[in-house]
A protein has these predicted regions:
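His/Asp/Glu-enriched, well-ordered alpha-helical/loop segment
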Residues: 1, 7-81
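Thr-Gly-centered strand-to-loop micro-motif
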Residues: 3-4, 121
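C-terminal cap of metal-dependent C-N hydrolases
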Residues: 73-133
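Peripheral (often C-terminal) accessory segments that flank ATP-dependent C-N-forming ligase machineries
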Residues: 134-138
Length: 138
């Protein structure tokens, strides 16, 4: 299983003595694009990425996600591995306004669908705040 840390502390919150700094980094929005870049560079297979991020976690928690099958949520992405870009904090949506991955190569999904609804198209957020929902262990 591969997972992301996401601790969206601002630069101001991080600008303290080491023992007073909140731990973690923002990572939820950049994790998958960084791994997709690894797929393009043949460091990681696409099958291993899908099983590690989608299939295995949904199997472990017994939730209806992780695969495109009847009876599961219609969550999926559309990716073009030829569309590589550099990560820029101004293009991300986290409240913290920075990323430790600034300038790294990545491949962001062209489209993101959640429960069959298109939420992202060509890096633009179409969905409204609050569309997501918590899905706990079944």
């Amino acid at each position: 299983i591969l997972e992301s840390d996401h601790a969206p502390h601002t630069i101001e919150e991080k600008d303290k003595e080491f023992d007073a700094v909140p731990s973690g980094v923002p990572g939820v929005e950049t994790m998958f694009p960084l791994f997709l870049y690894m797929v393009k560079k043949e460091i990681l297979s696409f099958e291993r990425l899908v099983s590690s991020i989608c299939e295995n976690p949904s199997d472990l928690l017994n939730i209806p996600k992780g695969r495109i099958e009847v009876g599961r949520d219609a969550d999926f992405i559309v990716v073009d591995l030829k569309k590589e870009c550099k990560i820029k904090s101004e293009n991300l949506h986290s409240k913290c306004g920075w990323t430790p991955y600034e300038g790294r190569s990545a491949i962001f999904p062209e489209y993101v669908f959640v429960r069959g609804e298109k939420l992202i198209e060509e890096h633009e957020m179409l969905g409204s705040k609050g569309f997501g929902r918590f899905v706990g262990e079944q």
